[in-house]
């Protein structure tokens, strides 16, 4: 993957944008160029932050001439919002809308060539977002969460019952003004967590930057919402071209369900990977997927 001398990436800027009066933090990457460039707006999945391997993808994209805005959802990472670690689907979709609006407002960015890139839970968010924004140039949905019921059924029933109990306790507590009841995002098999498949805990830890203290938990009330979230059902309304990067052995977002929803997308491409949900961020699996994503970008939203 050669770099053009005109596209040598600058160090990212740490920026903020407003989302319903809450400041969201982001890295803004720009290629060295004097012309308006396409912009890729990026965010992570379940409890993830911009520091968890998203910068690796952004660095590859900016080296090819694309600007990137990599943001943290409110309540997470470096973004504002209380209580911390509250995963609220409506708020996160609002953050996507605000991030796109901010990207379109920037100088030397072509507002008609904005791409959105999401992974895991964020891979579902970009589908829901694109269904309501016909101005987007393209969508990349990586190992996406598409169906709350399907993902819930992939879990051990006993774990599901325990999570529901914690969620109800947290929800009731939130009404009474109590502190949030937290539940682990990832844990070893047999432990209660949102992700406890055999590859989940080690895979999640592999995304953490060295020496980081990113919390591995979220407010449990989220469990009451995830089972009712079906972003995959909106794919038939998406007008932009969509690249689905599907992990065939995905333990978190079942690939069979993803493929069913992807088939209803009017303009879509599907790339298969014989990798698990967490493998795609690192090593050879990362090299394969980022190469395919760059190929898609160059064909669909080429840098002028």
From Swiss-Prot:
* GO MF assignments: carboxylic ester hydrolase activity
Q: Where are the transmembrane segments?
A: none
Which UniProt key words apply to this protein? Answer: Hydrolase
Reading the lineage from the top rank, the first entry is Bacteria
Q: Which Gene3D superfamilies match?
A: alpha/beta hydrolase
Query: What is the induction comment?
Result: Down-regulated in the presence of H(2)O(2).
**Entries under InterPro entries matching the protein:** AB_hydrolase_fold, FrsA_esterase, Xaa-Pro-like_dom
Family per similarity comment: Belongs to the AB hydrolase superfamily.
**Described purpose of this protein according to its UniProt entry:** Involved in quorum quenching (QQ). Inhibits motility and biofilm formation. Could contribute in bacterial competition, as it is capable of hydrolyzing the signaling molecules that mediate interspecies communication.
UniProt protein name: Quorum-quenching protein AidA
Taxonomic source organism: Acinetobacter baumannii (strain MDR-ZJ06)
């Amino acid at each position: 993957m050669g770099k053009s001398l005109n596209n040598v990436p600058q160090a990212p800027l740490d920026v903020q944008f407003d989302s319903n009066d809450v400041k969201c933090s982001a890295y803004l990457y720009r290629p060295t160029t004097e012309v308006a460039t396409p912009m890729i707006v990026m965010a992570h999945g379940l409890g993830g932050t911009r520091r968890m391997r998203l910068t690796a993808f952004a660095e590859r994209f900016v080296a090819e001439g694309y600007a990137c805005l990599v943001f943290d959802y409110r309540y997470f990472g470096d973004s504002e919002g209380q209580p911390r670690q509250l995963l609220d689907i409506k708020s996160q979709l609002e953050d996507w809308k605000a991030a796109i609006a901010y990207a379109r407002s920037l100088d030397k960015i072509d507002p008609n060539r904005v791409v959105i890139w999401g992974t895991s839970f964020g891979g579902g968010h970009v589908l829901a977002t694109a269904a309501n924004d016909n101005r987007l140039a393209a969508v990349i949905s990586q190992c996406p969460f598409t169906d709350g019921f399907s993902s819930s059924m992939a879990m051990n029933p006993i774990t599901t019952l325990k999570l529901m109990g914690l969620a109800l306790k947290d929800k009731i507590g939130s009404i009474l003004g109590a502190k949030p009841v937290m539940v682990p995002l990832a844990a070893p098999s047999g432990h209660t967590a949102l992700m406890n498949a055999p590859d989940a805990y080690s895979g999640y830890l592999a995304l953490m930057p060295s020496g980081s203290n990113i919390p591995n938990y979220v407010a449990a009330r989220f469990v009451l919402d995830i089972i009712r979230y079906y972003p995959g059902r909106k794919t038939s309304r998406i007008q932009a071209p969509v690249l689905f990067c599907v992990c065939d052995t995905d333990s978190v977002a079942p690939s069979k369900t993803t493929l069913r929803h992807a088939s209803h997308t009017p303009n879509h491409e599907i790339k298969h990977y014989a990798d698990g949900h967490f493998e795609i961020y690192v090593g050879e699996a990362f090299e394969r997927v980022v190469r395919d994503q760059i190929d898609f970008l160059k064909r669909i939203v080429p840098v002028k």
